[in-house]
Amino acid sequence: MNQQLSAAPQPTSSAPAATGDSPSAVLAVPPAPPAEAAALLRAALARHTDVSDVAADLATGTPGFTLVDSRSTAAWDQGHVPGAVHLPTASVPALAGRLLDPARPVVTYCWGPGCDGATRAALALAEQGFRVKEMLGGFEYWVREGFPYDTADGPRNSAPDPLTAPLRAADDCGC
């Protein structure tokens, strides 16, 4: 069977023309109109937060949400965010109603960007009526940004990874 690949879409009149002999890979599909982009980006922020924002809110002592670690017990013992509730994804249907307040938003996390456990846990929680967000980067980025964490052997802390976080506590990434 002979299949032919279709050519990449050409920029439309609403996108700037590419320079040179080839069309822009970035602008092959033009950017969304501003109102559409704003709606999509607002919707993304309604579903996601990041480790720095979670850490800042937890530091207040009254974050207004419950943080849920959706990983296995072995992963939890290896390290978890202080103050998180351990609720493995597979246990959400049976235990969420007993462990979580349905009036309080829930933020889920798993290992890191390559794991969809937090997404699956958030879906299961949303299907039970909980308001949910995922913590982007998961536990991996919590550690890489230098935030303290707990293990089965006690508290730990790692130096921030310069590729993911400012090296000095006084610095702010500007996000």
Language model segments and positions:
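Alpha-helical scaffolding within the catalytic cores
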Residues: 90-96
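Short Asp/Glu-rich motifs
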Residues: 95, 144-145, 161-162
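Short active-site oxyanion
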Residues: 61-67, 82-83, 105, 130-131
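Catalytic cysteine-centered active loop of the rhodanese-like fold, especially the PTP/DSP P-loop
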Residues: 97-143
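Flexible, polar/low-complexity N-terminal or interdomain linker segments that lie immediately upstream
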Residues: 1-78, 153-175
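Short, hinge-like loop/turn segments at secondary-structure boundaries
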Residues: 85, 103, 149-153
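Short loop/helix-cap segments at secondary-structure boundaries that form the rim of catalytic
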Residues: 76-82, 97, 142
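A contiguous binding-surface segment within folded domains or other stable secondary-structure elements
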Residues: 81-90
